[in-house]
């Protein structure tokens, strides 16, 4: 092997490495157990390159002149595919984060909001708890294997350095699913809190000297924790596991 072919092999390897990197990088920015709050950037970037180097299949990728001519466009396409994949894999965590925010809003505890390092946003205590709960269940149920399967599926649907067509309209369906599932999962607690508000209102009407609403936060918090304890081992646990077996959220975003 002469020096020119050796440099060409290195050039091809670096292009493949960057292509895989741009698809994997959004995963490490969006997933709550891989982002800035958990893994520092100085460690995360080398880890992404290490994982990307293990996913390179140079023998199965056709590196032609068109790749070098449109390399920036193809890299941008890889970023879009990585973002769509990250959105789909982050769906259960976003849903449970929204569930915690809805419950805290209904029980009047949003004053305790603080900066969540795992998400980088102003979040409530229950939102952080549900986010960690979903991450634990996700990893306990084989979530890392599911992530690798999803990455493999993304390359089957949209191979490296090939053109893909996206269904932009299905992104609205994705957002609808996010909002609807959050409301559905929070509905048992919301119903109980609504009934407690009604009972406290009746009590305050007939016994105003008791000042029932001064203890409403405590009562609603106890009721919310009780309902969450009942639902956590059945509804919430099974819902996270349900998303582990669903690849359709990602596949529906592409025209095949």
From Swiss-Prot:
Subcellular location: Cell membrane
Keywords assigned: Cell membrane, Membrane, Plasmid, Transmembrane, Transmembrane helix, Virulence
A Pfam family the protein falls into: Bac_export_1
Gene Ontology BP, a term: protein targeting
The keyword Isomerase is annotated on this UniProt entry: no
InterPro entries: T3SS_IM_R, T3SS_SpaR/YscT
UniProt topology in membrane: Multi-pass membrane protein
GO cellular component, one term: plasma membrane
Transmembrane segments: 13-33, 37-57, 79-99, 129-149, 183-203, 217-237
KW Glycoprotein (keyword) present: no
Entry's family note: Belongs to the FliR/MopE/SpaR family.
Function noted in UniProt: Required for surface presentation of invasion plasmid antigens. Could play a role in preserving the translocation competence of the ipa antigens. Required for invasion and for secretion of the three ipa proteins.
Record-linked PANTHER family: FLAGELLAR BIOSYNTHETIC PROTEIN FLIR, SURFACE PRESENTATION OF ANTIGENS PROTEIN SPAR
Name used for this protein in its record: Surface presentation of antigens protein SpaR
Species this chain originates from: Shigella sonnei
Gene expressing this chain: spaR
């Amino acid at each position: 092997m002469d020096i020119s072919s050796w440099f060409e092999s290195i050039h091809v390897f670096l292009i493949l490495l960057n292509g895989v990197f741009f698809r994997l990088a959004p995963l490490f920015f969006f997933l709550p157990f891989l982002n800035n709050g958990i893994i520092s950037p100085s460690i995360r970037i080398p880890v992404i390159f290490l994982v990307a180097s293990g996913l390179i299949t140079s023998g199965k990728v056709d590196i032609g002149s068109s790749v070098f001519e449109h390399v920036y466009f193809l890299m941008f396409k890889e970023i879009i595919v990585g973002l769509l994949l990250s959105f789909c894999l982050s769906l259960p965590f976003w849903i449970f984060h929204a569930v915690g925010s809805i419950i805290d809003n209904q029980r009047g505890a949003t004053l305790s909001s603080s900066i969540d390092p795992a998400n980088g946003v102003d979040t409530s205590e229950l939102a952080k708890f549900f986010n960690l709960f979903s991450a634990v269940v996700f990893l306990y149920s084989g979530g890392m294997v599911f992530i690798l399967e999803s990455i493999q599926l993304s390359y089957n649907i949209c191979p490296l350095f090939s053109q893909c067509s996206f269904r932009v309209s299905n992104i609205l369906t994705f957002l609808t699913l996010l909002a609807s599932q959050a409301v559905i999962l929070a509905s048992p607690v919301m119903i109980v809190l609504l009934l407690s508000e009604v009972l406290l209102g009746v009590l305050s009407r007939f016994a105003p000297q008791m000042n029932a609403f001064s203890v409403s936060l405590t009562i609603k918090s106890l009721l919310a924790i009780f309902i969450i304890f009942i639902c956590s081992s059945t509804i919430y646990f099974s819902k996270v596991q349900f998303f582990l077996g669903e690849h359709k959220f990602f596949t529906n975003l592409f025209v095949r």
